[in-house]
Amino acid sequence: MVLVNAISEKDYIKDSRRRKKEEKEFEKLRKLLVEGLEDIVRDKKVLKAMFRVPRHRFVPEYEQRAAYTDRPLEIGHGQTISTPHTVALMCEILELSEGHKVLEIGTGSGYNAAVMAELVGKTGHIYSVERIEPLVNFARKNLEQMGYDNVTVLLENGSMGYPRYAPYDRIAVTCAAPTIPKALLEQLKPGGIMVIPVGDYSQELIRVKKDSNGNIYKKRKGEVIFVPMLGRHGFPRS
């Protein structure tokens, strides 16, 4: 029995050292990735948040080695985690600050929510809506393991938003809609900003600003590719 315990302890120490080495390697790769984003994103707060969030902890194990490449990765159920440069760009467009209350449509693995959580701080909160239950569970586990207690993941169809906690300072949509859903515009606080991809095969990232009088202003921010939004204000199921 003593011998078994000794071997187990030895294996534990060996495994612990291996994991620490891997984490250091991932940190180096993350640093290189963030440095590569500096030509796309100028907001230093966003870049720091991107460095603080370990992307490899938000993808399936078989994708971890590719976590710090600037490309989308599969997370199962026909869904993907967005490219790091897209996540950073959307966060920059949103102009996130301490204390903001944010609605996210499309949680995925929880990675985007984690980056936004870094930017809104402990006094802010992210309400993230996801329609696929296994991804809700995956995201909750990832966020809990990383200590993000300022993120709430909700099992809902996001095409209607989430009126319970409205209005929101910011709304981030990580799936492409045919048009900007009226429900989301209504849930955006005056002075608030929303970022949303619009279109089917050819999508554009749109920055939406609501002024203090409720007037809506839209600005195109470039071409993107996202999975489609499904539901009442999304695309029909194929």
UniProtKB/Swiss-Prot annotation:
Catalyzes the methyl esterification of L-isoaspartyl residues in peptides and proteins that result from spontaneous decomposition of normal L-aspartyl and L-asparaginyl residues. It plays a role in the repair and/or degradation of damaged proteins. It catalyses: [protein]-L-isoaspartate + S-adenosyl-L-methionine = [protein]-L-isoaspartate alpha-methyl ester + S-adenosyl-L-homocysteine. GO terms for biological process: methylation; protein modification process; protein repair. The lineage of its organism: Archaea, Methanobacteriati, Methanobacteriota, Stenosarchaea group, Methanomicrobia. InterPro entries: PCMT (IPR000682), SAM-dependent_MTases_sf (IPR029063). Belongs to the methyltransferase superfamily. L-isoaspartyl/D-aspartyl protein methyltransferase family. GO terms for cellular component: cytoplasm. Its EC number is 2.1.1.77. NCBIfam families: pimt, PRK00312.1, PRK13942.1. The active site is at S82. Keywords: Cytoplasm, Methyltransferase, S-adenosyl-L-methionine, Transferase. PROSITE patterns: PCMT. Pfam families: PCMT. Its main location: cytoplasm. This is Protein-L-isoaspartate O-methyltransferase 2. It comes from the Archaea. It is found in: Cytoplasm. It comes from Methanosarcina acetivorans (strain ATCC 35395 / DSM 2834 / JCM 12185 / C2A). GO terms for molecular function: protein-L-isoaspartate (D-aspartate) O-methyltransferase activity.
